[in-house]
Amino acid sequence: MVLIIRPSQTLILFRKAMLKPIGRYPLKRNFFGLSGTNHTIREQRYVLRKAINAPPSTVYAAVSEVAQYKEFIPYCVDSFVDKRNPVDNKPLIAGLRVGFKQYDEEFICNVTCKDTDHTYTVVAETISHNLFHLLISKWTIMPHPNRPNAAMVELLLRFKFKSRIYNSVSLIFAKTVTELVMNAFAKRAYHLVRLAMLKPSSKEGSP
């Protein structure tokens, strides 16, 4: 779910050199088309922590509402929720579709959202395995220890491509991807804060 990035020179060269047509969608291509032997590929992990100037509940709202990803994540052409928790209405099964020119991929994930003692977690694990042996993202959101109305956010990304080549090349850009995703959510959370501030108070207009 987190491999949605703005193209950079490295990524453009990467695509030109490595991408092959698959034909999954009409007039489209898959991002990745190579396969490898599972035992030769190692799982990769990236952890990024960032202070975000928004309350933890606002950051949690931005991260957990997958259906809105298409509104603010670059090249996310569609995002959706197939199943929600009947108790809190948070996603249980969700997905997104990433498109860039003629390339197209869709990710479906099991999603687990938890709110425990002012600490929020959102875990997404892919159940569509055309690209990865493993793809898991975990967001941990908690109050900032020194700044009121701010959050301390950690994003853990674990993945293992089916392709040995892509698993190796990903070492070049995975850290940048993680940072871009974190920044996209930071901007989204700030946007939600501004919307809340501009929303008329329920007391306005009362006699």
From Swiss-Prot:
GO terms for cellular component: mitochondrial inner membrane; mitochondrion. The keyword Kinase does not apply. SUPFAM superfamilies: Bet v1-like. The keyword Mitochondrion applies. Keywords: Membrane, Mitochondrion, Mitochondrion inner membrane, Transit peptide. Interacts with coenzyme Q. This is Coenzyme Q-binding protein COQ10, mitochondrial. It comes from Saccharomyces cerevisiae (strain ATCC 204508 / S288c).
